[in-house]
């Protein structure tokens, strides 16, 4: 069987070696006589899986000891609703910087609980740039400042960590975590749905400075209290064990490949290939994002019309290049180049782009 190159924005491609190991261990895992999905999450066997996943993630991301690591059910949208409940008092101001679609989603989730203030918004310019930090209107007593590190739909990425002074900086890293070195101490909290760079859909990671967990937040059920989850090692309720196991395999694979530094180099190479094909096409392919904030993970581009976009998607699929259709909110084409996408995938896409232009340009 030949695997195609999968450019899906998420759920996204996973390392083939991880998938094959999971396939082998699905029915019977580690000599216990049962599948990993069948054993208790409180058994010594699974506790070892969970501990290894956290230890490897701490190594991969250089997570300091004064930061807690949570593995949570669900995705980033759930986390966005829980942030104000855990870290802001009722009616307290929180600042949000909107650089694309998912920044707006984060605001929608927080609005029922706190006084959401938009510190900056790239919408007037069409989300092709991020407003400079000097132009942000920050609330002096905000509970936190929230950014979306990488916007998968508009293809806009923070290339540097913004300086927000003494305010805690919270960031959605769902689509760019582990893609390049990150100084976690610059953040109060980062979070990520796993289904792009860390593993399968259904589990997320929250990395939070422990002192922030002492905040009273708002009245909430224990299941929505991050401090309670930390106290119970992310097992306050039954966790998604299969997803946790796959996340652990994926993180271990990333370490074996050379860690974040190696992926940063690889990701830069892949992005340069695709952007080079776009910029060198004489306008046949178009990407309007400012070069200083172009995403390395998600590259949207457009052809002359919707019919040509559709033809590109259908012909690329026939050529073994999957899931290149752009998000419904913007249309066009989108290539997602997460860590598990090899350079060969970007090379195959660029070769197809050149061929398609020759035939239809």
From Swiss-Prot:
N6-(pyridoxal phosphate)lysine sites (modified residues): 196
Gene it is expressed from: serC
Localization (cell): Cytoplasm
Subunit structure: Homodimer.
GO molecular function: O-phospho-L-serine:2-oxoglutarate aminotransferase activity; pyridoxal phosphate binding
Keywords, comma-separated and alphabetical: Amino-acid biosynthesis, Aminotransferase, Cytoplasm, Pyridoxal phosphate, Pyridoxine biosynthesis, Serine biosynthesis, Transferase
Binding site for L-glutamate: 42
Name recorded for this polypeptide: Phosphoserine aminotransferase
GO annotations of cellular component type: cytoplasm
């Amino acid at each position: 069987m030949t695997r195609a190159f999968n450019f899906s924005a998420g759920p996204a491609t996973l390392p083939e070696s991880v998938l094959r190991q999971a396939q082998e261990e699905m029915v019977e895992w580690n000599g216990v006589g049962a599948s990993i999905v069948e054993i208790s999450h409180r058994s010594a066997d699974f506790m070892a899986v969970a501990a290894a996943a956290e230890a490897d993630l701490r190594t991969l991301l250089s997570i300091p000891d004064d930061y807690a690591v949570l593995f949570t059910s669900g995705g980033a949208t759930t986390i966005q609703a829980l942030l104000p409940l855990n870290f802001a008092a009722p009616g307290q101001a929180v600042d949000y910087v909107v650089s694309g679609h998912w920044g707006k989603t984060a605001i929608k989730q927080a609005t029922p609980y706190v006084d959401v203030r938009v510190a900056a918004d790239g919408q007037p310019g069409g989300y092709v740039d991020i407003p400079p930090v000097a132009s942000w209107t920050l609330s002096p007593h905000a509970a936190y400042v929230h950014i979306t590190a990488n916007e998968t739909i508009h293809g806009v990425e923070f290339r540097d960590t913004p300086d927000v002074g003494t305010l805690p900086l919270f960031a959605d890293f769902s689509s760019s975590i582990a893609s390049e070195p990150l100084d976690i101490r610059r953040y109060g909290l980062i979070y990520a749905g796993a289904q792009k760079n860390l593993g399968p859909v259904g589990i997320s990671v929250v990395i939070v400075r422990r002192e922030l967990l002492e905040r009273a937040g708002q009245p909430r059920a224990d299941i929505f209290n991050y401090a309670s989850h930390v106290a119970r090692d992310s097992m306050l309720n039954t966790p998604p064990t299969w997803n946790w196991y796959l996340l652990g395999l994926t993180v271990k694979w990333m370490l074996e490949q050379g860690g974040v530094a190696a992926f940063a180099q690889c990701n830069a190479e892949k992005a340069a290939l695709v952007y080079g094909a776009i910029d060198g096409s004489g306008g046949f392919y178009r990407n309007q994002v400012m070069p200083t904030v172009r995403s390395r993970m998600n590259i949207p581009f457009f052809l002359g019309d919707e019919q040509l976009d559709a033809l590109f998607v259908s012909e690329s699929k026939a050529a073994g290049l999957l899931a290149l259709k752009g998000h419904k909110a913007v249309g066009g084409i989108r290539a997602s180049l997460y860590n598990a996408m090899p350079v060969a995938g970007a090379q195959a896409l660029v070769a197809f782009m050149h061929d398609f232009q020759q035939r239809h340009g």
